[in-house]
């Protein structure tokens, strides 16, 4: 008697089923984004704390913008990337009036998943770093899935 054990296969979401050519995306591609920190970007205004310095969610938003700048313009028509994972540390405060600069470098391609190494700096020092993952989706298929979720 022979037994064969197989792990259950993860079901691929429908918006990821079609194969697309991402060969024009290359490891090492970089994007960046900048922001002048204003009162509207502080933790009290965002709702993430009480100290009037750059809010972590704003830094993360800038990191995602840097990742978009690296690759979004190279994606095939009808496709875009969506953020699916962040592992970021925010380790230095930035006051209102100071400029911040975020960078994202594409370090790995795994099918439709794009993995970035990310960093953020203010005018004086590094303020955050980590990794960020995005997945490339067919926008029409993704929108259909969202409409089904809404019951439309």
Predicted feature residues:
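Short, residue-level hotspots on alpha-helical faces of the histone-fold
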Residues: 61-65, 69
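Hydrophobic beta-sheet segments that form the core/acyl-binding groove
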Residues: 88-123
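Intrinsic-disorder/low-complexity, polar/charged segments enriched in Ser/Thr/Lys/Arg/Asp/Glu/Gln
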Residues: 26-32, 85, 99-101, 113-115, ...
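C-terminal output/interaction extensions
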Residues: 128, 133-152
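Hydrophobic beta-strand-centered segment that forms part of the acyl-chain substrate-binding groove
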Residues: 68-101
